[in-house]
Amino acid sequence: MTFRALLLSAALMATSTTAFADIGDSETITGTDDVKLTATHLETFNKPWAMAFLPDGKALVTEKEGTIWLLNAEGKKLGEITGGPDIIERGQGGLGDIYVPSDFDQTGEVYISYVERDAKDDSLSGAVVQSATLAISSNGGSLSNMKRVWTQSPKVQGNGHYGHRIGVSPDNFLFISSGERQKFTPAQNMNTNLGKVIRLNRDGSIPEDNPFVENGGIASQIWTLGHRNPLGLDFDSEGQLWVHEMGPKHGDELNKIVRSENYGYPMVSNGDHYSGVEIPDHETMPIFEAPAVFWVPAISPAGFSIYKGDVFADWKGDGFIGGLSSQALIRVDMDAEDGPSEAGRYEWGKRIREVESGQDGAIYVLEDEEGGRLMKLMPATE
């Protein structure tokens, strides 16, 4: 697989022309690709984590401390969604992803991920994915029929690297990204689902054609292994799954997910441990699947959307990644001649947690932490 290191100096970073803070304010942002975007501030949240659009153009936003918001088609808060799970926010854990399948109009079903504490030992935690029925009202809505479809196992100490991003494939399988919980070796252990990409039937049962189904137990859930902290996933127009993950100290990755493959962590990485201990690069062990793209320095990827709209016609099929430490929106040309590569970077000045594409063709960005803004991106007009 073709891959490349992408090193961009601060001098090449994108610039914004104005500062803004109030809802309704807009600014023009110019990327390293010289494309100008108009970014409009639609709404503000407290530690937002994920966003999903409903078929009618309304949207849902999760906040890490446990609130789920319903937004109108203009991105304004209509009210809260009640009936969600009880949340204890700690470290990187709390309320996580929310996903609206394409058959929502027929089923009313959504998926939610969050972190739960162990009932007997509060120091232990793990991610959970539940399905639920969502009923919408004029000023919010409610969740009912909550059903656990997946549990991260085992629960371990620490409050990081949960992953817990959710997607449903075009052929109707449930995919979940699971981080290795900052424990390194579980990513290679087939008796845990830590550090894996998981494939399930929509009800949480095991597909009979999963690659390790004959192993039984937890291994039967596993689609791929050797992942660190995968915080973004999406399917392209051909149904191919792509997942990005944070590397250790540098070496963030965008991976083309191939059934049963091992992506190498912690045996290989294009980054090194924070302790300074070196990790062999991917090229030293070709037995492992190498990333399509890796980043040195790190971008700290979070949120991922492959653009399928028409407003940005030249960007159809491109991937958009939010950057936490890089405080930037990164565009990846997924169809570049030599393989996927970074094609543009929009300096943001704030950590980006989530990126989504709307039915209106706009790109939506959620900033991280308290006061995180929801921003709508459209082509800038001269």
Model feature map: region roles:
Residues 40-41, 77-85, 140-151, 204-212, ...:
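Beta-propeller fold detector
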Residues 227, 338-359:
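Conserved blade-ending motifs and adjacent loop-strand segments that build the rim/top face
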Residues 1-21:
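Gram-negative bacterial Sec-dependent N-terminal signal peptides
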Residues 218-253, 258:
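Repeat-solenoid scaffold signature
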Residues 21-38, 138-143, 205-215, 267-286, ...:
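Blade/loop signatures of beta-propeller domains
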Residues 283-298:
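Aromatic-anchored helix/helix-loop segment that forms the rim or "lid"
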Residues 21-184, 232-234, 240-243, 247, ...:
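Acidic, Gly/Ser/Thr-rich repeat motifs that build Ca2+-stabilized beta-propeller blades
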Residues 126-138, 190-203, 257-258:
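Beta-propeller blade signature
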